[in-house]
From Swiss-Prot:
This is Uracil phosphoribosyltransferase. 5-phospho-alpha-D-ribose 1-diphosphate binds at R78, R103, D130, P131, M132, L133, A134, T135, G136, G137, T138, D199. HAMAP family: Upp_B. Pathway: Pyrimidine metabolism; UMP biosynthesis via salvage pathway; UMP from uracil: step 1/1.
Length: 210
């Protein structure tokens, strides 16, 4: 499985700022947006292109354009929405597919409660957006959903990832590419990433308990 930990100095600087527990909601949200743009830039570096001839100021000119159908972005509710503006700034024509999952209290497995996927997924690159890759359960369920709908080229973009989640993902979806700003140390007994970022959703939306 292709796993890319983006070591660009700007990415490392910004993920370090995100780890500050005293960072304001506004500051956290802005950094998540900026990191979304930077990580999406890395994740789209291997997209296929095709030649296209268009009018230029001195006559016809051959240029390169992204091949195939428009990319679809797949933010996982709710924290994934925080990354969406930054990625859309880079890929403004992208389609947006939104999924929401919650844990079944009996089986402890993630089950979908919201699903709005764009059409022709088999022709599109799908970029899953979620700040945290922890156990991998939610991500795996999202990929299962996308593949059932026809998606074939899937990448995941995360701010931080845990080794346990990466291992779980590789066991079932080794064809999925992962791009992250940091691979952290481990999960604690409650399944939280350490050192992590805290609850990214609460920090993005300002719903954490002060």
């Amino acid at each position: 499985m292709k796993i890319v930990e983006v070591r660009h100095p700007l990415v490392q600087h910004k993920i370090g700022l995100l780890r500050d527990a005293a960072l304001s909601t506004k500051g956290f949200r802005e950094l998540v947006t900026e990191l979304g743009t930077l990580l999406a830039y890395e994740a789209t570096a291997n997209l296929d292109t095709e030649s296209h001839v268009q009018p230029g100021w001195a006559g016809p000119v051959e240029v390169q354009r992204i091949a195939g159908a428009k990319i679809t972005l797949v933010p996982i509710l709710r924290a994934g929405l925080g990354m969406l503006p930054g990625v859309l700034a880079l890929i403004p024509a992208a389609r947006v597919s939104v999924v929401g999952l919650q844990r079944d209290e009996e089986t402890l497995q993630p089950v979908p409660y919201f699903e709005r996927l764009t059409g022709r997924l088999e022709e599109r690159d799908a970029l899953i957006l979620d700040p945290m890759l922890a156990t991998g359960g939610t991500l795996i369920a999202t990929i299962d959903m996308l593949k059932r709908a026809g998606a074939r080229r899937i990448k995941g973009i995360f701010l931080v990832a845990a080794p346990e989640g990466l291992k779980a993902l590789e066991a079932v979806h080794p064809d999925v590419e992962v791009y992250t700003a940091a691979i952290d140390d481990h999960l604690n007994e409650k399944g939280y990433i350490l050192p992590g970022l805290g609850d990214a959703g609460d920090r993005i939306f300002g719903t954490r308990v002060e």
